[in-house]
Amino acid sequence: MKTLYSLRRFYHVETLFNGTLALAGRDQETTGFAWWAGNARLINLSGKLLGAHVAHAGLIVFWAGAMNLFEVAHFVPEKPMYEQGLILLPHLATLGWGVGPGGEVLDTFPYFVSGVLHLISSAVLGFGGIYHALLGPETLEESFPFFGYVWKDRNKMTTILGIHLILLGLGAFLLVFKALYFGGVYDTWAPGGGDVRKITNLTLSPSIIFGYLLKSPFGGEGWIVSVDDLEDIVGGHVWLGSICILGGIWHILTKPFAWARRAFVWSGEAYLSYSLGALAIFGFTACCFVWFNNTAYPSEFYGPTGPEASQAQAFTFLVRDQRLGANVGSAQGPTGLGKYLMRSPTGEVIFGGETMRFWDLRAPWLEPLRGPNGLDLSRLKKDIQPWQERRSAEYMTHAPLGSLNSVGGVATEINAVNYVSPRSWLATSHFVLGFFFFVGHLWHAGRARAAAAGFEKGIDRDFEPVLSMTPLN
């Protein structure tokens, strides 16, 4: 493809490393980028960039398959998943594969199949990545114009956006079909402590689905993270899938309007920055979801949430002391508030003590004991079931607190188990990665805007001290 502008003019930031290390097309002289700038060398080589992306997808899918099989090989059915450091099998179990009542694993074969399918897929992607990176055409515009593009071709860019949106919409519908037709998904709220069930009565009311988006993100409200029934989750995927598919068709059929052409920067680096910004939002949202939500991330597989473990401890000692003769309705604690039960700011009966801060927790083992005004004293005296006691004792000793060296659990709880909860791992990793992606978004957005405006801030690369130093090799 003929270059329509001077590389020097377009790639504002040049950092000379050592031009003698590389071949033509891969060195600084011919691309304007040093070897470590990675895919920046491929900005105008659509064929090679395709290879890089397909190979990257292959690495991702290879990790998924290999890690999946690793978890299957190490899995012990007698222990809960969250005690074994698993992060992939809980996702498969949540989708209803291999589990039965109470989240008990009945069959690990579906997990094995999942791992093998991902490994085989990664081999196909890996071959495609190597082919396009090394053997295929450098640019696709001449031989395969449908797959070719120029970054500033606004119509082509929105067509590619549309194709991506349609694929995302189909992905959302995969969950819908699994929940509706292919065996159902795991519902932690099923009576008696959770079970796999088909979700038949979807929530499609726009006021409910979009009402989540309008909620406050703070305690008691919790934005979309507060979703607590599968009908809403699956119904939300119907809405999301439909919007993505319709939006994708719209973007394929239309050209950007004048206001959009003016508002956006239309370059490869700008698109990179938009994508990184979106992924940062996904990362932060996923962090909050896995930390607080025990419906999309059932506690049977991921362990209790922090508030859940705390409330479970209060419940466990209420049960114990009630058996020993305490009157849990009137016993006073050291601060003058109720020792076992007290009232929330809005008048509900809640657990007393330090766990009062988590009074708005909802959990399947606790909800049967609530009445119209919070915890029901008569139910606490007469209706507590053995499965509720067992589960709360288990969750009390598995709080999602823990450091990298696995000293987990509540420091003052002598029965706590030494482990790190998958909720801790997943929330921390998604927060940290989301933050890094956000910084990458700011970095690339700044560069893209500076390039579009025709200036850059930074040191003058022509007189950089390193240029007068001896090459490293």
Curated annotation (Swiss-Prot):
One biological process term in Gene Ontology: photosynthetic electron transport in photosystem II
Propeptide segments, given as residue ranges: 1-14
Keywords linked to the UniProt accession: Acetylation, Chlorophyll, Chloroplast, Chromophore, Manganese, Membrane, Metal-binding, Phosphoprotein, Photosynthesis, Photosystem II, Plastid, Thylakoid, Transmembrane, Transmembrane helix
Positions of [CaMn4O5] cluster binding: E367
Membrane topology: Multi-pass membrane protein
Localization per record: Plastid, Chloroplast thylakoid membrane
Transmembrane segments: 69-93, 134-155, 178-200, 255-275, 291-312, 447-471
Residues carrying Phosphothreonine: T15
GO-annotated cellular components: chloroplast thylakoid membrane; photosystem II
InterPro entries: PS_antenna-like, PS_II_antenna-like_sf, PSII_PsbC, PSII_PsbC_sf
Positions of modified residues (N-acetylthreonine): T15
Single annotated GO MF: electron transporter, transferring electrons within the cyclic electron transport pathway of photosynthesis activity
Pfam short name (any one): PSII
Family of the protein in this entry: Belongs to the PsbB/PsbC family. PsbC subfamily.
Subunit structure: PSII is composed of 1 copy each of membrane proteins PsbA, PsbB, PsbC, PsbD, PsbE, PsbF, PsbH, PsbI, PsbJ, PsbK, PsbL, PsbM, PsbT, PsbX, PsbY, PsbZ, Psb30/Ycf12, at least 3 peripheral proteins of the oxygen-evolving complex and a large number of cofactors. It forms dimeric complexes.
The protein's role, per its UniProt record: One of the components of the core complex of photosystem II (PSII). It binds chlorophyll and helps catalyze the primary light-induced photochemical processes of PSII. PSII is a light-driven water:plastoquinone oxidoreductase, using light energy to abstract electrons from H(2)O, generating O(2) and a proton gradient subsequently used for ATP formation.
Official protein name in the record: Photosystem II CP43 reaction center protein
Organism for this UniProt entry: Ipomoea purpurea
Protein encoded by which gene: psbC
